[in-house]
């Protein structure tokens, strides 16, 4: 797993879509993946899967700067499992550099 990051409880995190979460007012983009937008085919399913994964907390956020939209770019782990990798393997996400 990446650096120490921040350990959060599941109730503190909300899925915005399949590759973006919210912690308070902070929007966090999951690094390394892209999922369909909510209005696109597969977007709702990806968001629901991410929501279910987050409920399995605790959640570790390992920041890697910000993206072009100002969102925190981070590796996200649930119970030490990489969320991006889980979503890719399960077919909800594609790799994104």
Indicate where each model-derived feature is located.
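Small beta-barrel nucleic-acid-binding modules, primarily SNase/OB-fold domains
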Residues: 1-97
């Amino acid at each position: 797993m990446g650096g120490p990051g921040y350990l959060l409880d599941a109730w503190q995190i909300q899925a915005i879509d399949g590759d973006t979460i919210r912690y308070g007012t902070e929007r966090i983009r999951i690094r390394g993946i892209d999922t369909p937008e909510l209005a696109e085919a597969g977007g709702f399913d990806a968001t629901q899967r991410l929501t279910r994964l987050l409920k399995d907390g605790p959640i570790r956020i390992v920041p890697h700067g910000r993206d072009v939209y100002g969102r925190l770019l981070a590796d996200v782990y649930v119970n030490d499992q990489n969320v991006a990798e889980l979503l890719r393997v399960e077919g909800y996400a594609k790799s994104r550099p």
